[in-house]
Amino acid sequence: MINEHFERIVKEKFGFDFSPTQQAAMKNFLAFLFDRHPESLFLLKGYAGTGKTSLVAAIVNTLLQFEQQVVLLAPTGRAAKVFSGYSHQPAFTIHKKIYRQKNAREGVGIFNLGFNGNANTLFFVDEASMISMGSQDSNFGTGSLLDDLIEFVYNGRNNRLVLIGDTAQLPPIGVDVSPALEADFLQ
């Protein structure tokens, strides 16, 4: 039905036949997409060169064709630029999207978690392995980028999160594995 139609359009936009792992990822994404649990999260992991970003770009452009709101994010400006280049859609750093500077009386250079005015939106975050739990000394939000990102996304009405990353990449400083790519941790 709609799942098959959606998948067919993604395949057309992708431009190649899916590998077995991409086919499995597509099947799992469709289950996530049509799951109406309000706080569900989709985790897409794969090594470099497996086609994660290309698959997500095809999914994003198909979602836009169906008039689904999407926001594309990445931890760094460079990663956001690459994500935007693949998807042909604007992408932003996580910090730019979720934080707002406090007013001058409260302190210059201090950033609070901003208001999320998005509703019914899928937030896609590429290079999620770079997202850290942070430190208390941070000038941004709670000091935990991952916690702040999750809080920001789910503070909006009917928003959900898709985290994309490579477990073979180095984790954030001070941890052995990237918490943003650990399903057990995210639950």
What spans do the regions from the language model cover?
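Conserved ATP-binding/catalytic motifs of P-loop helicase motor domains
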Residues: M1-Q187
